[in-house]
């Protein structure tokens, strides 16, 4: 059954349904409503109203996204890139990453322990493998080098 989004009430209801499932950014919500056939003017009006009512919040979305991705083992560089691709402002992203309260070094160590069972690399090939994995996950080479050299280990 296809829902027709030809009224402001229908657009608003669909937006609220999406927001009830999880936080969304304005750009992401706009894209989803357009895919469902809503007119751009109605989308803007509905989203402006939801923002005024506090139901749509970029800062809540950023906080939720950063927290979720960090718990999934991703670092700040990867999270920053994903949020940029979702149309969020760089300054807002940087602020959210600074204020999230996550210890990125602890996050790096946890991700490394889960993947590699806490075993430091024994040769250059293994070191490169672990470094590539952690770099892909969004951690800086400086943090990775410090970890893999054994300088930041709590054990």
Swiss-Prot record:
Keyword Protein transport: no
Source domain of life: Bacteria
Keywords annotated in UniProt: Cytoplasm
One Pfam family of this chain: RecX_HTH3
Subcellular location: Cytoplasm
GO biological process, one term: regulation of DNA repair
The UniProt record lists the keyword Secreted: no
Chief location bin: cytoplasm
GO cellular component: cytoplasm
PANTHER family named in the record: REGULATORY PROTEIN RECX FAMILY PROTEIN
Family named by the database record: Belongs to the RecX family.
Function description: Modulates RecA activity.
Name assigned to this protein: Regulatory protein RecX
Taxonomic placement: Bacteria, Pseudomonadati, Pseudomonadota, Gammaproteobacteria, Pseudomonadales
Gene encoding the protein: recX
């Amino acid at each position: 059954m296809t829902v027709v989004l030809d009224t402001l009430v229908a657009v608003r209801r669909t937006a609220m349904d999406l927001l009830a499932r999880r936080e969304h950014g304005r750009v992401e919500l706009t894209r989803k409503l357009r895919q469902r056939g809503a007119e751009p003017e109605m989308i803007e009006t509905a989203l402006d109203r939801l923002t005024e009512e506090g139901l749509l919040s970029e800062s809540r979305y950023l906080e939720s996204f950063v927290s979720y991705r960090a718990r999934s083992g991703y670092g700040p560089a990867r999270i920053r890139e994903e949020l940029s691709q979702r149309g969020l402002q760089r300054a807002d992203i940087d602020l959210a990453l600074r204020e999230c309260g996550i210890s990125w070094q602890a996050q790096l160590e946890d991700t490394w322990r889960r993947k590699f069972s806490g075993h430091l690399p024994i040769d250059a090939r293994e070191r490169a493998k672990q470094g590539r994995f952690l770099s892909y996950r969004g951690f800086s080479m400086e943090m990775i080098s410090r970890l893999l050299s054994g300088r930041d280990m709590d054990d």
